[in-house]
């Protein structure tokens, strides 16, 4: 399940950068950004294939994409943050 909400201001600043890129439709730093997130772990609410998409939240100093992601749903401001590569998710509250 989703573990509640998290204020955008409480997330790493790179999460805001990623949300801004999503809002402007890129360009994204990784070719995998924007791919369909399949929700194989069934942590997010069950939806049809293609409902969710994933984007990398850059980890400074990391040599890979790291473990931080934002998953977007089709609803307005339905953006989830995971800092542990899909083990847990929090809905991002962009008003705080």
Curated annotation (Swiss-Prot):
Primary location recorded for the protein, binned into one broad class: secreted
Top-level taxon of origin: Bacteria
Disulfide feature: 7-96
Coiled-coil annotated residue ranges, if any: none
GO cellular component, one term: extracellular region
InterPro entries named in the record: N1-like, Ribonuclease/ribotoxin
Active site: 54, 85
Compartment(s): Secreted
Entry keywords, A to Z: Disulfide bond, Endonuclease, Hydrolase, Lyase, Nuclease, Secreted
Gene3D superfamilies per UniProt: Microbial ribonucleases (3.10.450.30)
Family to which this protein belongs: Belongs to the ribonuclease N1/T1 family.
Name the record gives this protein: Guanyl-specific ribonuclease Sa
